[in-house]
Amino acid sequence: MSVLLVLFRMVGGWLLLAVVAGLISGFSNASLLAMINHSLTLPQTDRWLGPGVQFALLALLMLATRVISQTTFMYLGQKVKARLRVELTRQVSETRWLQLEKSGMSKTISVLTQDLDTLVVFFVSLPNLFIYGAVIAGCLVYLATLSVSVLGLALAAIALGSLGYRAAHGRAMGLLRQSRLREDTLIQQCKKLFDGGREYRLNADRRRRFVAGELADNIEAVRQQRTRGYVLYGLATSWGSILFFAFIGLVLFGLRDLLTLEPATITGYVMIFLYMIVPVEGVLSSLPTLASARVALQRVQQLREDLPPEQTQRPLPAEPFRSLALEAIRYQYRGEDGESFTLGPLDMRFSPGELVFIVGGNGSGKTTLANLLVGLYPPDSGAIVLNGRALAGDRQEGYRQLFSAVFNDFFLFDDVAFVHERTAEQVNHLLRLLKLQHKVRFAEGRFSTTALSQGQRKRLALLQAWLEERPLYLFDEWAADQDPEFKAVFYLELLPMLKAEGKTIIAITHDDRYFHLADRIIKLESGRIVQSAPL
């Protein structure tokens, strides 16, 4: 019951209350059976007086504690789900970007949705697990008062049923784990179906091959694995019922004379075993949910291990930006296919009010260098030197806050985290310059819309970066998908405006027409600097 121990640490006393209420309800249920069986032997004159009142009170206790147990478990299910979501999303937000890239979005989303929903279903099924378990225990205790020998037969039936269940349990668990791993791939494939929707509609053969082949095969594999797993659990449940009826028949028709059982004892025995069939099936049918919850918790724990939070951070010294240098920086990227790319060793320096262009062909390492510069990738060796001091690992968060960036695969927010000393007049001027004044308004730190074309969204991302007013700006091929008019605005008006404010601008670009505007050009080839000279 390691799952319950983990959950108990999360919710503490509430879980204990729900468990105790469920056990009381189950034992009350079993006590009602004992009262019913006992009432059959009472004299006619006494049957409806004291025992009737006791029966009513016991029934009320059973119902009240059942309601308490069920509602508490439902409440706890949602509480645990919300708590884990908060903890995991906070951990995702605090994990190094490199670790998040390696882990992948699909696995994280799957844990935050499907696995946490599995835990909620588990909580909903817990009342029956404890209530039925208590009913079974209470029935066995009552059975012991009737006949120890029959109790031994009952325990033998339960033990034999447990062995059959355990034989199926290991195989079923393995199938459920495999299906959960396949569902991660299935989420990726469904995302691919949406992300590549336009291209698929332009290539019907590709679409049909993907939907009818790769996607359908994975859906079928998930179905088969889950079906086999749950069928095994179903067979185990049926095996328990078969054994119960077999032992009822054995006692009634095979061992009755050998055990010298009285008719009242046989009646009580049969009633107890018939009464226990539903609880036993209920407990066994709840076990797959317990197994799924165990798998879900394992995946939650694995996600926590895969996304370790960054070490505790300290703020940077309160001083203006004076210089940034990369000294013998080296970084090796390893792809999923086993291929690697090495950037460096690199040496470069940046100063306030400087405009630097980084150029190079595809695969030369420009984007990797950009991630290193802004602190998203940690270097394997070398040092980042800020204002003459090597940057420590516990200063990374503060270092990243020096940058505003527009990446090539940028994300556009509809709000600005913090607007500095920009005036409404300046914002409106830039909106007009970017020809967005008729589509977007900016008020109270928020844009009125982000539902724009890709080029317009990129212009809005530039405006957002400008509003943050950081000392360093990184633009990763910002002008690549802009028409000549906005390229000219970017190079001839916006970059000089930022430079005049004393900002350091690092722009990855292929626009050789504007190379003369840079103070310095750094050219990369195969991860090495082949040119770094002022113009």
Residue ranges and their predicted role:
Residues 9-65, 144-151, 263:
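Transmembrane helix-loop-helix hairpins at lipid-water interfaces of multipass membrane proteins
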Residues 93-138:
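Juxtamembrane loop-to-helix connectors within ABC transporter transmembrane domains
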Residues 231, 276-313:
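Cytosolic ends of transmembrane helices, especially the final helix of ABC transmembrane type-1 domains
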Residues 374:
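Helix-to-loop junction immediately C-terminal to a conserved catalytic motif
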